[in-house]
């Protein structure tokens, strides 16, 4: 009996060790109220701690912090990926296939203007994925994606 319990504990420790860790990302915004509405009402993120010049958000289990920078000026640059002009820099989350589909529908219903509309990228190739891009009200570019086979996230 003790051996069984110890085996389960070791297995749990291994699983916890290999689970992805949440990231923390702080981004500049020029108008905190406008961006707070976007991240909470449009993206559906839950707000955490806040002050008059920053707000924490739960972005699919990751900590995103909006920090006021009244002089924030986004330099827009694009690189070609799969024949599309991808905004750089950008950030986002890799979702499950079904979660991506419902999130893309939510964004469409909320009237988000896509830089790159949801589409299947690298079809039939390693790393096949659904992806979409849009800007938040401060001009920060976001990408959300879902891999057909999550084992191919780093496939080449």
Residue map of PLM features:
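Vicinal oxygen chelate
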Residues: 18, 22-30, 58, 78-156
